Structure formats: C-alpha cells, structure tokens
Amino acid sequence: MDHDDLLGAYRRLRLLREFEERTRLEFQTGQIAGFTHLYAGMEAIAVGVCEHLSDEDKIISTHRGHGHCLAKGCDPAAMMLELWGSTDGLCRGKGGTMHIADFSRGMLGANAVVGAGAPIAVGAALAASMTGASWVAVSFFGDGATNIGSVYEAMNLAVVLKLPKIFVIEDNG
C-alpha cells in the first residue's frame, strides 16, 4: 500500500468510528428503535479486508454490520436513514441495524443469527463458481460463532468444492 492507500484506509477507519459514535448517540436518544450492536473498536478488521476486495466481491455481515457496510463502500447517509426506519434507507427502513444490506455495493446483508452468514456466503461463492464469475464471497463473524455447527459445515463445503470464499473470524468479546 502506498501513502495514498494508507491515507484512504485511515479515513475509512475514522468514518466507521464516527458513524458508530453517531449511531450510539441516536440510539441513546431514542432515534433508533429496537436494538443496536456497535462495531466500534474493530474498524481495522473490516477496512483491512474490504480494502483488498473489488466492487464485484460480496460480503455477508453479522448483527454488528455497520462497519462492514461502510468498509465495502455503502453510503453512510442512506445507512443512517435505514437505522432511523426511513423509506429512503438502504432497505426502505425494513432492515434496520441488524439486517442492513446494499446489493449494489456487494453487501449481501447482515444477519442477526450468530454464525448464519457463513453458509449464506458459501452459497454466494457457489454461485460465483457455477457461473464463472471472478468475485469472491467473504463472511465476517464473531468468535462466538465458532461453536456453531453450520459454520464448520460451510467451511468444509467451501474447501471440498474449492470455492472462492474467505472466512473472517473477529474477536469481538
């Protein structure tokens, strides 16, 4: 990475942290309904991975998906509108904080079920393999998902079929 790449990565790190700080404040004042799980403190993981992905590559996130969305290039204003429940949000206000997605950026969605993104991302990787597409699928999940059977089944299938798949385990606890 050259100086400009490093500066761009730093700016994305700051964007992720500032977005999470704003999200925390909006949640505390009741502007964001339901639950919210912040990604603050883990920004370097998402930025470090997504920095090396193409626009065509796909990602699947967790219930802590804001950072992954932003690192993949999703629009922060549209994301905040989504968290507020606005019909102008990324998912028309229906996805909220734990189910946010932006297919146009390769963000196939966040999933509130622990470990559920790994098999979904393997399905995306299988689609790439079967159609001859050149993109890879990345699933992010926390260390708590490493005791979920479907995560290991997804890993096994990805290896057996030699799929274009990356598993990112985040120590978030």
Region annotations inferred by a language model:
Residues 164-167:
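Short, proline-centered helix/strand-breaking motifs
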